[in-house]
């Protein structure tokens, strides 16, 4: 392709809307252009990158025996109501674009396709002889992000590969899951990315287990915790660890003590001259289920630890059937205005006790009359602890479970693991922290959707059984931008060869020099004929502008028909290292060919 004929405009200044390096560079280098909030046009250079990523994804998926298809973007609400996710996606998380057609039928623009694929399986799969089967698509998805940001990282429209597998039993699912794990690792390696596969929370998709694939980058939105021995890695939302040991309590006798102005753990520990590890803090949450029921939740956790609200939400979802609900649509620490809806009397905030009475709740049809009481594992064995006295300005000291306070029945792990904690699998290992960009997520769904939607098959004994499912997503457009976030310098993008829009760029410093033009044209033709995808910068621009643009755009190899031409050589510059060497004209094609082959 000739740059003189391409829609190609670069920017010298960083756009105001861009926050992270990859977003700035893709805009400046003319790869994307913003159309609206979270909506971007993929311009010719970007489209080539996306096609290359898609092709690698396609090859690795096909190698596992998966079959490509294309599913509808418009999805009837009835399917989502069958699975129980319509309210979750339109009200709770609120990420689905919902609309009505002219017959007032509800539809959603697909953020994911579990319901559609389960409907297809229900209609078409009858026998175990048809299994296993794995279907995938590469398609535009839509999500109504609250705060679209970072360009293609968190947009409202994006390109994704999603796959859905059907097996006869959990063992078959595990094999498919392992195949997908291997395929995803191959995809990321072939794209030239440094990554970690980590344990993850399944979120609204559900299922028994899941794993995320994180591209490591300082601007990553996710925190990854891992051990140096390579045996553990998890998203912080899912991570488990051993907390620091608690210090011995200095309070041997039970007493109530005045503790003015100690409504935080830090103030309390300073006032009592004790460690936060001997304090039981009691945190009040307000949970709203998908049927509108409000439930008040009291969590007891050690004073030096924080509640992981993803873990907490998962525990509360397990309790949903008790309230004739399916999921949580909101979870928050209630402020004073929220408390007015249900508080029968003023709460002693900052001084709440583990036995806060249910009489604080003014129950109704929409408000559960009793607290859900959850105790974190960090305080179950705590002795002679400090905690609130249910009276402003007072705490109790030297308290114990089974004596002064009844230990709640629901013992859970809702603490946030953090860097420096000891690993569960090996106490000598400590958790390290890194930032990551989630580009892939694989799930073992089990029978969640097939049970809900009646998707079954007949086994060898003639019994009707639910299909065992898995789902596997990888963000094509997000992966492409992640590559930039992982590899750039002060001058621009440094594309991995495998997904660069072009392998090489031939730059003519002076288009008024017939020899430079002639050699460049011949080389351009020969490189493309040799399978090296090549750009020709034949624009009527200053040489300095052309060199700056080539570095900004990030093409792996730059060939210049400049000064060394008089000696029968061309200057070849490697973008990643900026290493420059003069190579005889007749050796340039074979040299670039070898470099590209080695990099792929």
Swiss-Prot record:
Assembly: Homodimer.
SUPFAM superfamilies assigned: Class II aaRS ABD-related, Class II aaRS and biotin synthetases, YbaK/ProRS associated domain
Assigned GO CC terms: cytosol
GO biological process: prolyl-tRNA aminoacylation
A GO term, aspect molecular function: aminoacyl-tRNA deacylase activity
Main location: cytoplasm
Protein's UniProt name: Proline--tRNA ligase
EC numbers, comma separated: 6.1.1.15
One protein family per Pfam: tRNA-synt_2b
Record comment regarding domains: Consists of three domains: the N-terminal catalytic domain, the editing domain and the C-terminal anticodon-binding domain.
Keywords: Aminoacyl-tRNA synthetase, ATP-binding, Cytoplasm, Ligase, Nucleotide-binding, Protein biosynthesis
Family: Belongs to the class-II aminoacyl-tRNA synthetase family. ProS type 1 subfamily.
Gene: proS
InterPro entries reported for this sequence: aa-tRNA-synt_IIb, aa-tRNA-synth_II, aa-tRNA-synth_II/BPL/LPL, Anticodon-bd, Anticodon-bd_dom_sf, Cro/C1-type_HTH, Pro-tRNA-ligase_IIa, Pro-tRNA-synth_IIa_bac-type
Cellular localization per UniProt: Cytoplasm
Entry function: Catalyzes the attachment of proline to tRNA(Pro) in a two-step reaction: proline is first activated by ATP to form Pro-AMP and then transferred to the acceptor end of tRNA(Pro). As ProRS can inadvertently accommodate and process non-cognate amino acids such as alanine and cysteine, to avoid such errors it has two additional distinct editing activities against alanine. One activity is designated as 'pretransfer' editing and involves the tRNA(Pro)-independent hydrolysis of activated Ala-AMP.
Catalytic activity annotation: tRNA(Pro) + L-proline + ATP = L-prolyl-tRNA(Pro) + AMP + diphosphate
């Amino acid at each position: 392709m000739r740059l003189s004929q391409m829609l190609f405009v670069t920017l010298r200044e960083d756009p105001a809307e861009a926050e992270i390096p990859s977003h700035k560079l893709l805009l400046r280098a003319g790869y994307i252009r913003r159309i609206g909030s979270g909506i971007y046009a993929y311009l010719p250079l970007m489209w080539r990158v996306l096609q290359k990523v898609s092709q690698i994804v396609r090859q690795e998926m096909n190698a596992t025996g998966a079959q490509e298809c294309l599913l509808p973007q418009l999805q009837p609400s009835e399917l989502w109501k069958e699975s129980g996710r319509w309210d979750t996606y339109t009200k709770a998380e609120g990420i689905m674009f919902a609309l009505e057609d002219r017959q007032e039928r509800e539809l959603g623009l697909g953020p994911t396709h579990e319901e559609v694929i389960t409907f297809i399986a229900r209609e078409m799969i009858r026998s175990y002889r048809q299994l296993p089967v794995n279907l995938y698509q590469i398609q535009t998805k839509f999500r109504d992000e609250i705060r679209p940001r970072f360009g293609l990282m968190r947009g409202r429209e994006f390109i994704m590969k999603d796959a859905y597998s059907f097996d006869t039993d959990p063992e078959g699912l595990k094999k498919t899951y392992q195949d997908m794990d291997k395929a995803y690792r191959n995809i990321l390696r072939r794209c030239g990315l440094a990554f970690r596969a980590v344990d993850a929370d399944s979120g609204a998709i559900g299922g028994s287990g899941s794993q995320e694939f994180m591209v490591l980058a300082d601007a990553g939105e996710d925190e990854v915790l891992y051990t140096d021995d390579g045996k553990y890695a998890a998203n912080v939302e899912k991570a488990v660890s051993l907390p620091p040991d608690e210090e011995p309590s200095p309070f041997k006798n039970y007493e109530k003590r005045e503790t003015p102005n100690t409504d935080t753990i830090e103030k309390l520990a300073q006032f009592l001259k004790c460690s936060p590890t001997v304090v039981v803090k009691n945190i009040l949450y307000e949970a709203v289920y998908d049927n509108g029921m409000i439930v008040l939740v009291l969590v007891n956790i050690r004073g030096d630890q924080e509640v992981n609200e993803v873990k907490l939400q998962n525990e509360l979802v397990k309790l949903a059937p008790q309230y004739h609900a399916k999921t949580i649509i909101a979870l928050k620490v209630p402020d004073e205005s929220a408390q007015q809806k249900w508080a029968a009397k003023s709460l002693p905030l900052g001084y709440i006790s583990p036995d806060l009475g249910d009489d604080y709740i003014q129950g109704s049809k929409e408000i559960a009359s009793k607290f859900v009481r959850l105790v974190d594992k960090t305080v179950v064995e705590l002795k002679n602890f400090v905690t609130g006295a249910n009276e402003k300005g007072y705490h109790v000291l030297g308290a114990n479970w089974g004596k002064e306070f009844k230990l709640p029945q629901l013992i859970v792990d809702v603490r946030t693991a953090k860097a420096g904690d000891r690993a569960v699998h090996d106490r000598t290992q400590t958790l390290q922290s890194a930032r990551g960009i989630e580009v892939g997520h694989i799930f073992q769904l089990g029978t969640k959707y097939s049970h809900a939607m009646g998707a079954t098959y007949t086994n060898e004994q003639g019994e009707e059984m639910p299909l065992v499912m898995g789902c596997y997503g990888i963000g094509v457009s997000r992966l492409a931008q992640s590559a930039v976030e992982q590899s750039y310098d002060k001058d621009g993008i440094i594309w991995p060869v495998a997904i660069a829009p072009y392998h090489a760029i031939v730059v003519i410093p002076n288009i008024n020099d017939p020899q430079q033009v002639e050699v460049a044209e011949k080389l351009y033709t020969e490189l493309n004929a040799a399978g090296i995808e090549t750009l020709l910068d034949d624009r009527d621009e200053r040489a300095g502008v052309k060199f700056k643009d080539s570095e900004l755009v990030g093409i792996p190899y730059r060939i210049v028909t400049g000064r060394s031409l008089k000696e029968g050589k061309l200057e070849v510059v490697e973008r990643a290292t900026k290493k420059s060497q003069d190579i005889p004209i007749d050796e340039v094609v074979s040299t670039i060919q070898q470099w590209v082959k080695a990099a792929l």
